[in-house]
Amino acid sequence: MRTSHFAAVVLSALVLVLPLAARAQAPQADVFDRVTHGYAVSEGGVKIHYASLGKGPLVVMIHGFPDFWYTWRHQMAALSERFQVVAIDQRGYNLSDQPKGVENYDLRLLVGDVAAVVRHLKADRATIVGHDWGGVVAWQTALAMPQMVERLIILNLPHPNGLLRELRSNPEQIKNSEYARNFQQKPPTDPTVFFGMPMTPQTLSGWVRDPVARARYVEAFGKSDFEAMLNYYKRNYPRASGADLPATPEPPKIAMPVLMFHGLNDQALHSDGLSGTWKWLEKDLTLVTVPGAGHFVQQDAADLVTSTMQWWLAMRVPK
């Protein structure tokens, strides 16, 4: 990591967070059998499944690729002591509807799915949490519907400006994004589409370390649509890079407080994309970089992520 990019990070936040993380341990009780399940109806009648735990101000959590609502199990268990924590299955995954056609995975519709869940739960505003593609959706929800997003938490997904900048100018990020080109160009039936392997429930869940959790992932991916998973890339991910990537209008500044985590061993999204994030925000940024954690930082560093979320939200949500 190029540490010179991060001189402006709010170090005082880390001074407060790290002692807390050392003391706190994420609850060990699994949430799989404790959550209640429901569905919100989005545009076109698409049903979005969610798992809910706890009561209080609403927190909506959005997974990425390849994943499902259960990725947030550690955070849900802890945050549910003060919040209603709702983790969705994005369209195409697990128990949510899986409409055919790449056009049905446009970012506008993915944002609409989040809004449908918030409205279904009769809330005006929520803390929105997103990882990977869920981070893309979370950023865009904050931009398109700022009145609905009270606070924003992003895991391993740079601000859109930072990601586009790196795709234009950073050879490492351009190389790291070759997998996305593969997803855009190949069908899910190609035997090499998934990092040289076929897409199966087993290969897609190979990154999950805990054997009990992995079995649940295999089951969830067995219910998912692999073509839908790739449609996120085919519809929304830039098809060009380097000098060929066209300029895009700069979006407005993010209007709410932001907490970001980034596992520094991420092989897909370079940490250089974080540099300058504060220039694109109106309010405070707390940035937590996590050495030793990879792309799935919410699981690789579950205790740190969970305790930091608790601390950060406690500072901003009245009791």
Segments predicted by a language model, with ranges:
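Structural cue for short, hydrophobic secondary-structure segments
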Residues: 61-64, 87
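Catalytic histidine-centered segment of alpha/beta-hydrolase-like enzymes
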Residues: 293-302, 306
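Sec/Tat signal peptide C-region and signal peptidase I cleavage site
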Residues: 20-24
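Bacterial N-terminal signal peptides
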Residues: 8-19
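Serine-hydrolase catalytic-loop signature spanning alpha/beta hydrolases and amidase-signature enzymes
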Residues: 66-74, 85
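Flexible "cap/lid" subdomain of the alpha/beta-hydrolase fold that forms the substrate-access gate
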Residues: 26-38, 46-48, 53, 58, ...
